[in-house]
Amino acid sequence: MAPALPFALPSLAGKVYLVTGGNTGVGFHTVDELAKHGARVYMGARSPGKAEAAIKTIRAETPTADVHFLQMDLMDLHSVVAAAKSFKEKETKLHGLVNNAGIMATPYALSGDGFEAQWQTNYLSHWVLTWHLLDVLVRTLQAEGGAAGSVRVVDVTSDGHNFAPKVGIDFKDINLEKAGVFARYGQSKVGNILHAKQLNKLYGPSGSETAKKGIWTAAVHPGHLDTNLNKQTAFPKFVNTLLRAVGAYSPPRDGAFNSVFAVASPEFKVADSGEYFVPGQKKKQPSKVARDMELAGRLWKWTEEELRKRELLD
């Protein structure tokens, strides 16, 4: 049996959650912990086979686990929109969204939508997913009587956001074709933090009444983990082997702690909404650009405009 969580987590019976990238690594353990506590959890993933295998593993330990596969391909924005619509056909409530899926330091590649792979997978697809789920998130908050912390959105980011370009988000060259793999990764992770902060500003507990305040948000760094994410990187395999040998990586389950804490624990308070968390459920200031609210607003506007051009927000 796994050790107890390092924070309080009550029964989540009657609550519904969606976790992207839920079939592996941090996402898998996030789904597992929520399901163990009685929640209904949707596992967002691209591969039906891998998702069903992951669900089978969860149910082997927790036979009553209420976990369901929701197909989505984050490298295809239309697939993400379709996934959001599919979810809303199945459920009328969503208490928590964990934008978890991601890739790290991968070789330069463009999606079919024309965006650099890390930018789209880590940031852009999660923005559009959240956008299309805002209506059900708001309805859930209303159904819960506006109860504090009853609806939350968590963006999984990284301390790798410090590798971003000096400007944070390079709107003049959003795909960063000539930059290094970690600069592109860093930009996407800055995007995650700014998304959580702007979402909190618009829909969070400090927002206006007209913005339907009350959705709590957070950006969380899971830590340096021994997951499949490291296998995707462009640097040599011996680097991962060395880091693993010297104990530089934590177990994937530990990486899920911040996500579960932020999306469901009563120990996460209203003052925590919109903040950046590092391992140990500790708040920390992110980089200067990642806490620039003017940049957060500009990025939100840029993203909305780009997606409207592609008729993805209608």
Curated annotation (Swiss-Prot):
Family annotation (Pfam families): adh_short
GO terms of molecular function: oxidoreductase activity
Active site: 185, 189
Null allele phenotype: Abolishes the production of asperiene C, asperiene A, calidoustene A, (6-Strobilactone-B) ester of (E,E)-6-carbonyl-7-hydroxy-2,4-octadienoic acid, ustusolate C, ustusolide E and calidoustene B. Still produces ustusoic acid A, ustusolate A, (2'E,4'E)-6-(1'-carboxyhexa-2',4',-diene)-9-hydroxy-drim-7-ene-11,12-olide, calidoustene C and RES-1149-2, all compounds with fully unsaturated acyl chains.
Metabolic or biological pathway: Secondary metabolite biosynthesis; terpenoid biosynthesis
Enzyme class name: oxidoreductase
Function noted in UniProt: Short-chain dehydrogenase/reductase; part of the gene cluster that mediates the biosynthesis of various drimane-type sesquiterpene esters, compounds that exhibit diverse biological activities and are widely present in eukaryotes. The pathway begins with the synthesis of the backbone drimenol by the terpene cyclase drtB using farnesyl pyrophosphate (FPP) as substrate.
Protein name (Swiss-Prot/TrEMBL): Short-chain dehydrogenase/reductase drtF
Organism whose genome encodes this protein: Aspergillus calidoustus
Gene this chain is encoded by: drtF
